[in-house]
Amino acid sequence: MLLQKSAKTIMKREYDNENRIHLYGISQYWAAFDKSAYLLEKMTNKESETTVLHFKDYPFPILMYCLHYEKVKDLCRKHIMAKQNPDYLQLLTHHIAPKSYSQ
């Protein structure tokens, strides 16, 4: 699984994240984790389910939110893409206060 091999990189990106959605390509879906998952869920009006993941090497639960690549393609037309690779996208979005994420 993506998190097993890239968890440190993903969580490092999410640590201070307040206005970016980091998306990772998984087959026909794009997955967002932690704060990116929260932002994506708010942006898409909960079109998908949020999954809570637990890893033995990470002390906190990690949120995961997945969308079909067609839905993400629509989002890319409406939002600024900061980075685009075949298996990684970064979208700019509105700023979130850390307090609103932790609730």
Language model region names:
Residues 1-103:
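Basic, polar low-complexity surface loops/patches
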